Regions:
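Conserved N-terminal structural module of periplasmic/extracytoplasmic solute-binding proteins
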Residues: 1-71, 90, 94, 276, ...
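Short, solvent-exposed loop/beta-turn-alpha elements that line the ligand-binding surface or hinge
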Residues: 84-97, 166-168, 184-204, 256-260, ...
Length: 398
């Protein structure tokens, strides 16, 4: 009996959704195949796919792949171009059933490298009850965000104003820094991922993150140990009043059995900088299902990928606690009864920016991890820290 092997980013809704989707697939297609999942934390997943070459050696058939790893995987020949398979065995209503922003990041180097699976633009997530009790408006600037976090900070009640996810996994710090720079009218990278870190916007962004991280009257302790998942769970447990994080954690707060904040959650655009050029932006990073180049059962793998991309299975992804990627799911009445703000995904995507496409983006992200770690743990001038990071990234992309 064939066994489909899938590498999954550790997150309970991913695992439960894939298992249920495969069970539905098995009922619909009598192939007699089994399922084996490798559930891995973020850094372990990257190591399994790239350093250990699990995508090339035949030990995996499908993987969850973050869009900022796509160029690295494609350049190393680790994933298959899906264009020929879409031509031979197309997916119904592809591509019009998806927002263009969920198809662009996979379209490069003459191919299409992954099917969207889990969405989650970054956004402001907040407790409606706490803002109302404090007579606070929804923060529209970073200064207002910081002030609201201070106002709502109440450790004696087991609640912090906000929290930062600074665990050095090549994602959280990197994303937060890019959002901070963009929201101040800057751009941390140009064409080909050329760094633009020695700018007033980058300096202002780093100063803000340093000041926020140091403010124990606004921020939960332990930021270097928090990743986006742990931060999201803190919010769902009622321990954080507001945060910038992935939309999926707002949805989780409405669906998770152990949530303490159900019915008291709302989302809004990310705050902007206060200076000239300040604007609200989001970050478009999402998870795709990619076909392992070394898979020995690609027809079976593609058949399951097509099944998981159907409208009922995308809705199931959402009902399990992740975030579906089809427009039909975003507007689905059942989904919006459970998660009243789910339809706002379309609007959030209108403000979404993208990270540069580069095969060494993971290495660039580690430089920004180091930058944030030094900024929040030392008093070194931000200009010297940014100059050092600029030089390191220049060497990477040279």
């Amino acid at each position: 009996m064939p066994t489909l092997r899938i590498a999954v980013r550790k997150f309970d809704p991913f695992e439960s959704a894939i298992r249920r989707q495969f069970a539905d697939f098995a009922r619909a297609v009598d192939h007699g195949a089994g399922l084996e999942l490798e559930v891995l934390e973020l850094n372990d997943l990257h190591r399994r796919l790239f350093e250990q070459r699990g995508l090339a050696d035949g030990s995996l058939d499908i993987t969850f792949l973050s869009t900022d790893w796509l160029a690295e995987a494609q350049a190393a020949g680790l994933i298959d171009d899906l264009t020929p398979r879409l031509a031979r065995a197309p997916i119904a209503d592809f591509p019009q059933a998806w927002s263009p922003s969920l198809l662009e990041l996979q379209s490069f180097a003459g191919g299409f490298w992954g099917l969207p699976y889990h969405d989650g633009p970054a956004c402001l997530i907040y407790r409606t009850d706490l803002l109302a009790e404090a007579a606070l408006a929804v923060p529209r600037t970073w200064a207002e965000f910081h002030a609201a976090a201070r106002r709502l900070h109440a450790p004696r009640l087991g609640r912090h104003g906000t929290a930062l996810a600074l665990f050095p996994d090549g994602h959280n710090s990197f994303y937060d820094f890019c959002i901070q720079v963009w929201s101040r009218g800057g751009d941390p990278f140009g064409d080909g991922a050329r760094p633009r870190l020695c700018s007033p916007a980058a300096a202002e962004a780093l100063e803000f993150l340093r000041a926020l991280a140091a403010d124990d009257a606004a921020v939960a302790p332990g930021a270097p140990e928090l990743d986006s998942v742990k931060l999201g769970l803190l919010f769902c447990e009622g321990k954080v009043a507001l945060m910038t994080n992935w939309f999926g954690f707002a949805a989780l707060g409405e669906r998770w059995r152990e949530s303490r904040v159900k019915g008291r959650i709302a989302v809004a655009p990310i705050p902007r900088g206060t200076g000239y050029g300040g604007r609200s932006v989001s970050l478009n990073v999402f998870w795709v299902l990619a076909l392992a180049a070394g898979s020995r059962q690609k027809e079976l793998a593609w058949s399951f990928m097509r099944h998981a991309a159907t409208a009922p299975m995308d809705k199931l992804t959402t009902l399990e606690g992740a975030i579906g990627v089809r427009r039909s799911t975003w507007s689905d009445p059942d989904v919006n009864r459970l998660i009243p703000f789910f339809h706002e995904l379309e609007v959030l995507h209108e403000h979404a920016r993208q990270l540069p496409v580069h095969p060494r983006l993971a290495d660039i992200a580690r430089v920004i991890d180091d930058l944030l770690a030094k900024a929040t743990a030392t008093s070194l001038p931000v200009e010297s820290l940014l100059r050092e990071a600029q030089e390191r990234v220049e060497r990477i992309v040279a």
